[in-house]
Amino acid sequence: MHGRPSRPLASSSSSSSSRVFSFFLAPRVFLFLVVVVVVVFLPGRSSCWWLEGTEELEEEMGFAGDCSPVSGGGLSENGKFSYGYASAPGKRASMEDFYETRIDGVDGETIGLFGVFDGHGGARAAEYVKQHLFSNLIKHPKFISDIKSAIAETYNHTDSEFLKAESSHTRDAGSTASTAILVGDRLLVANVGDSRAVVCRGGDAIAVSRDHKPDQSDERQRIEDAGGFVMWAGTWRVGGVLAVSRAFGDKLLKQYVVADPEIKEEIVDSSLEFLILASDGLWDVVSNKEAVDMVRPIQDPEQAAKRLLQEAYQRGSADNITVVIVRFLEGTTTGGGPSREAASDQNS
């Protein structure tokens, strides 16, 4: 009676223990799986969000693995300018920023073509503009003789062609376009949306584009004159939907959200040091003056672009981040001191 329990009793005890074990373990296994799914597939966060605050961010660029920015650069054959770029999804799970850096020859003239394209509603519009805008521009019959007209017409033509290509899509997509065209000693900056162009001239940080926002008085008036409206929905939005007042695409709002670029021209002389083109992933957290001060001592434009990208990421930018820098080499000054904020700079 007091010997070893019979085998069935041992089996019964084991079965009872298993049931107790399962009772406590199963919910924990389920909870663990839920946590894994939530962490891995958490919407709105990049696959690299977990690097924040860890020692990996102390590396030279503050990124690791899939978080490393795409970067590169080059030098024009005539030696008059160099360029660099850096681009990364940042804290976003998807990438909707695109960029273009291109050196071409037209009628014996060396042409520099640089652009940043920040998509919304997906990447389709930004990718299309990257692939077609500059190709359309250099084929324009007035490209050399009347370059400003050529730029304006090409922006609108490319927008129209994209909208035709979008006819089968039910979801709207759009894109900003901040571009710089370098022809001889002329720098022409054309902008649609809220990507921004800033130059450093003689130490001054000067915005050479305007962020197109629907709460600007002239933009709001244009939208309302066209039959649209602007309302507050977290920020001022066209039709309560779109936070920029000009863009490529956005076919459902096209009557109000135009692709007419604002174009500014700068003369390339010894006082013009460099140009920064960037998406709002940079400008949301770094002022024009701060960006110029960071770039000015760095002669390699690729390293300068990576420096700005790193700074925006570490300051908590919630968006994709793309930076293109063009440094003008002929007769430029290369001071390393802090820049002066120009009076005309309204976007700092």
Curated annotation (Swiss-Prot):
The cellular location(s) given in this protein's UniProt record come to: Membrane
Q: Which UniProt keywords apply?
A: Hydrolase, Magnesium, Manganese, Membrane, Metal-binding, Protein phosphatase, Transmembrane, Transmembrane helix
User: For this chain's UniProt record, which GO biological process terms are given?
Assistant: regulation of intracellular signal transduction
Q: Name one Pfam family in it.
A: PP2C
Write down the superkingdom of origin: Eukaryota
Binding positions for Mn(2+) 1? Answer: 118-119
Q: How does it sit in the membrane?
A: Single-pass membrane protein
Q: Which Gene3D superfamilies match?
A: PPM-type phosphatase domain
Q: What does the cofactor section's free text say about binding?
A: Binds 2 magnesium or manganese ions per subunit.
Keyword presence, Transmembrane: yes
Recorded catalytic reaction(s): these are: O-phospho-L-seryl-[protein] + H2O = L-seryl-[protein] + phosphate; O-phospho-L-threonyl-[protein] + H2O = L-threonyl-[protein] + phosphate
Q: Which GO terms describe its molecular function?
A: metal ion binding; protein serine/threonine phosphatase activity
Report the EC code(s) recorded for this entry: 3.1.3.16
Where is it mainly found? Answer: membrane
As for family, the record states: Belongs to the PP2C family.
Indicate what this protein is called per its UniProt record: Probable protein phosphatase 2C 10
Q: Which organism is it from?
A: Oryza sativa subsp. japonica
